[in-house]
Amino acid sequence: MFGGGGGMNPRKMKQMMEQMGIDMEDIDAQEVIIRTPDEELVFDDAEVQLMEAQGQKTYQVVGEPESRELGSGEGSAAAEGDSDESDSSSGVDEDDVELVAMRAGVDEDTAREALEANDGDLADAVDELE
């Protein structure tokens, strides 16, 4: 992007980036976790940089990750908690039930029934109850 840049003065490089509207910032991260469908990549003491250009933020993580299967380690409690979010008999998310109940001013059982009747569509459930 900057034509080699191998011998470029870091101060000059920073000045050029500022002129182009690119802002970089180091983030003091203790741990970075990237969760994929199959595993977690855990970076301890990773170097993290935030680069903001044209209103878009990009995070760069540098370090050696430790790979662990989902469901092991610290993240497993959060992952198991997510599975309890939906009611096993209806498949309706509890957060959705609470939101519909609050918006429509009804109890959670009524909100759950409305969500089930509307295939989980929040707007239709609220409209039906109002």
Swiss-Prot record:
InterPro entries: NAC_A/B_dom_sf, NAC_arc, Nas_poly-pep-assoc_cplx_dom
Any coiled-coil regions, as ranges: none
UniProt feature, compositional bias: Acidic residues: 81-98, 116-130
A Pfam family the protein falls into: UBA_4
Residues passing through the membrane, by range: none
Domain (NAC-A/B): residue spans on this chain: 7-74
GO MF terms, alphabetically ordered: RNA binding
Gene3D superfamilies: DNA helicase RuvA subunit, C-terminal domain, Nascent polypeptide-associated complex domain
Classification via PROSITE patterns: NAC_AB (PS51151)
Keywords of this entry: Protein transport, RNA-binding, Transport
Region entry Disordered, spans: 54-130
GO biological process, one term: protein transport
Keyword Transport: yes
Biased composition, class Basic and acidic residues, residue ranges: 105-115
Similarity annotation: Belongs to the NAC-alpha family.
NCBIfam families listed in its UniProt record: archaeal-type nascent polypeptide-associated complex protein
Role noted for this protein: Contacts the emerging nascent chain on the ribosome.
Complex formation: Homodimer. Interacts with the ribosome. Binds ribosomal RNA.
Protein name: Nascent polypeptide-associated complex protein
Native organism taxonomy: Archaea, Methanobacteriati, Methanobacteriota, Stenosarchaea group, Halobacteria
